[in-house]
From Swiss-Prot:
Residues 1-382 are annotated as: Required for formation of endosomal tubules when overexpressed with PIP5K1C. The modification 3'-nitrotyrosine is found at residue 485. It is a peripheral membrane protein. CDD domains: ArfGap_ACAP1, PH_ACAP. Residues 538-549 have a biased composition (Pro residues). The lineage of its organism: Eukaryota, Metazoa, Chordata, Craniata, Vertebrata. ANK repeats lie at residues 606-635, 639-668, 672-702. This is Arf-GAP with coiled-coil, ANK repeat and PH domain-containing protein 1. Changing residue 129 to Q: In a colorectal cancer sample; somatic mutation. It comes from the Eukaryota. Pfam families: Ank_2, ArfGap, BAR_3, PH.
Length: 740
């Protein structure tokens, strides 16, 4: 043990000893101050550590709560469970570290302050008392006169006693100083050692805890990397869809209701206004859904659904042109009826078509469930003749020659129409009326999901078919359309799906064929095409269109302009040229497939449109084809004359009837201020005058809320049949009436 104070110097009580005493006392006083400060800091550290520990445990609980949010995700649940257990173990180790730190502070530092320094203070007090007593004895002994022997002897005895007491206390003080000096070194170093060992134990336990998760962390990192890549792809797709939807929204397009095929059949959902059945007849907006062969609605998601039609097979749907509100249709069941209102004409047609398709799907499913049937049970088609009829003025199936079977047989008799256009399943009973192809029920559902701007789906057995539409289907067909939309399939070595392929494969094929148009024959650059005749000088001839073998006597057998001349035309100009006399439906379909605007305006011919061009050619089928593909029945030329004006001027009664059925504006006036009725009266065309006056009467009755009678429908139906089946007779009739 190193001796800081020399005992010999202590006995001598030399100035060196006194100086050493003062120095040691100053050091011990500073030590006491610093130890007390360390204790205070340690107490603050422990308090902060416990706050940190409590906050950390609350933080871990918050992480655990994330696993209970939303639907269970196994990967996230496993990750959070493993990491929260590990974090809790680390926090337990941290609590042990705090306890060890507190114990070390109490055992080493606090003991040193309370016990070691207390003995030092007592020894110091005794030392200085002894020093004062010795000083007083020395002074008294020195002051005793020589003549006072007795007093001198007493003073000497007191001095000896004081010196002995001082020396004993001085030796005790010196010993206490030396002991406290050494104890200070040992206790402080032991305190630091224990503190570091507690820290080492804490971090060692944390390292071991995290090491157990090392492999899992690596695997999770790889999985997260893949998830990030997938998320980036999804984000890119969402951004692209966001841009498309934003452009669509800025373009003023209406949102379409959701239509898809679900496990319980066709599913369509969207908002409709519903008229209450109470005395006030109030209208309320509700969320309607067609699913599981039922029509239901609800106000809020958590509200129970209200069933409007329990079984779609026992109901019919019809338009309500006589209603005070626009865009109304009625669903009529055996026990009640429900008047509904869409937001626009297009949404109205979508909803009506969806209800009809759902009715068809319900009957098809019932027929599959009940098959095979006996000969006496019937086919099951005629039983639903009135259930799916659209009360819009079209021909009902019961009035068609031959009924349902006649339409199916007539359409399927066209070359290639006996099997589905997209998957080749035999006996298709659905059709896309704007494309002119037949489809199986599964492909028809996929076509319906594309939207009516790509494909308008109708049932061959369940929907009403106007005679001109049946004839249009027979003029086009699967072979012609596939020669257009599948022109490069063999060159691209693409495999066409078969009847046994999955829905996903068929859906991918149909999307690539009609939406992406991957298999079309590529046209020259737009820069190289023109709207006039011929082609630019120096440009090589365009390869001819796919060879199409038409039937003799049909529109497909009419001569077409040379392919070299057509190939140099803009798709819109090509559509315009093909719509003229003589019209060519295959070329028109080809132009539309290549992006032709169905309302393309020919500035060189008085801003005429393809529909006006087809009207001039008196082609009922070309006009029907253009209208089915979105042609505007009211778009006028530079003289302010629309298709109805031109049909009236030219005396084409069948076309006038067609345009009136498609909503042509009766009050539209040309640049000379004449409406179609004025023109018809000037040309003395009795048939067209009759049609126009009937249409005006129908409008007036609808404006007054009157239901009207069936005469209007019967007359229009007769003219439609005559225009489709015997157009020459209709032309002769118009000529005879004109000459009377």
């Amino acid at each position: 043990m190193t001796v800081k104070l020399d005992f010999e110097e202590c006995l001598k009580d030399s100035p060196r000893f006194r100086a050493s005493i003062e120095l040691v006392e100053a050091e011990v006083s500073e030590l006491e101050t610093r130890l007390e400060k360390l204790l205070k800091l340690g107490t603050g550290l422990l308090e902060s550590g416990r706050h940190y520990l409590a906050a950390s445990r609350a933080f871990v609980v918050g992480i655990c709560d994330l696993a209970r949010l939303g639907p269970p995700e196994p990967m996230m649940a496993e990750c959070l469970e493993k990491f929260t257990v590990s974090l809790n173990h680390k926090l337990d180790s941290h609590a042990e570290l705090l306890d060890a730190t507190q114990h070390t502070l109490q055992q080493q530092i606090q003991t040193l302050v309370k016990e070691g320094l207390r003995g030092f203070r007592e020894a110091r007090r005794d030392f200085w008392r002894g020093a004062e007593s010795l000083e007083a004895a020395l002074t008294h002994n020195a002051e005793v006169p020589r003549r006072r022997a007795q007093e001198a002897e007493e003073a000497g005895a007191a001095l000896r006693t004081a010196r002995a007491g001082y020396r004993g206390r001085a030796l005790d003080y010196a010993l206490q100083i030396n002991v406290i000096e050494d104890k200070r070194k040992f206790d402080i170093m032991e305190f630091v050692l224990r503190l570091v060992e507690a820290q080492a134990t804490h971090f060692q336990q944390g390292h071991e805890e995290l090491s157990r998760l090392s492999q899992y962390r690596k695997e999770l990192g790889a999985q997260l990397h893949q998830l990030v890549l997938n998320s980036a792809r999804e984000k890119r797709d969402m951004e692209q869809r966001h841009v498309l939807l934003k452009q669509k929204e800025l373009g003023g397009e209406e949102p379409e209701p959701s239509l898809r095929e679900g496990p319980g059949g066709l599913v369509m959902e969207g908002h409709l206004f519903k008229r209450a059945s109470n005395a006030f007849k109030t209208w309320s907006r509700r969320w309607f859904t067609i699913q599981s062969n039922q029509l239901v609605y609800q106000k809020k998601y958590k509200d129970p659904v209200t069933v409007v039609v329990d079984d779609l097979r026992l109901c019919t749907v019809k338009l309500c042109p006589d209603s005070e509100r626009r865009f109304c249709f009625e669903v009529v069941s055996t026990s009640k009826s429900c008047l509904l209102q869409a937001d626009s004409e297009r949404l109205l047609q979508l909803w009506v078509s969806a209800v009809q398709s759902s009715i068809a799907s319900a009957f098809s499913q019932a027929r599959l469930d009940d098959s095979p049937r006996g000969p006496g049970q019937g086919s099951g088609h005629l039983a639903i003749g009135s259930a799916a009829t659209l009360g819009s003025g079209g021909m009902a199936r019961g009035r068609e020659p031959g009924g349902v079977g006649h339409v199916v047989a007539q359409v399927q008799s066209v070359d290639g129409n006996a099997q589905c256009c997209d998957c080749r399943e035999p006996a298709p009973e659905w059709a896309s009326i704007n494309l002119g192809v037949t489809l199986c029920i599964q492909c028809s559902g996929i076509h319906r999901s594309l939207g009516v701007h790509f494909s308008k789906v109708r049932s061959l057995t369940l929907d009403s078919w106007e005679p001109e539409l049946v004839k249009l289907m027979c003029e086009l067909g699967n072979v012609i359309i596939n020669q257009i939309y599948e022109a490069r399939v063999e060159a691209m070595a693409v495999k066409k799906p078969g009847p046994s392929c999955s829905r996903q494969e068929k859906e991918a094929w149909i999307h690539a064929k009609y939406v992406e148009k991957k298999f079309l024959t590529k046209l020259p650059e737009i820069r190289g095409r023109r709207g006039g005749r011929g082609r630019p000088r120096g440009q090589p001839p365009v390869p001819p269109k796919p060879s199409i073998r038409p039937r003799p006597g049909s529109l497909r057998s009419k001569p077409e302009p040379p392919s070299e001349d057509l190939g140099s035309l803009h798709p819109g100009a090509l559509l315009f040229r093909a719509s003229g006399h003589p019209p060519s439906l295959p070329t028109m379909a080809d132009a539309l497939a290549h992006g032709a605007d169905v309302n393309w305006v020919n500035g060189g011919q008085d801003n005429a449109t393809p529909l006006i061009q087809a009207t001039a050619a008196n082609s009922l089928l070309a006009c029907e084809f253009l209208l089915q593909n979105g042609a505007n029945v009211n778009q006028a030329d530079s003289a302010g004359r629309g298709p109805l004006h031109h049909a009236t001027i030219l005396g084409h009664t069948g076309l006038a009837c067609l345009f009136l059925k498609r909503g042509a504006d009766l009050g539209a006036r040309d640049s000379e201020g004449r409406d179609p009725l004025t023109i018809a009266m000037e040309t003395a065309n009795a048939d067209i005058v009759t049609l126009l006056r009937l249409a005006k009467m129908r409008e007036a009755e609808a404006a007054q809320g009157q239901a009207g009678d069936e005469t209007y429908l019967d007359i229009f139906r007769d003219f439609s049949l005559m225009a489709s089946d015997d157009p020459e007779k209709l032309s002769r009739r118009s000529h005879d009436l004109h000459t009377l």
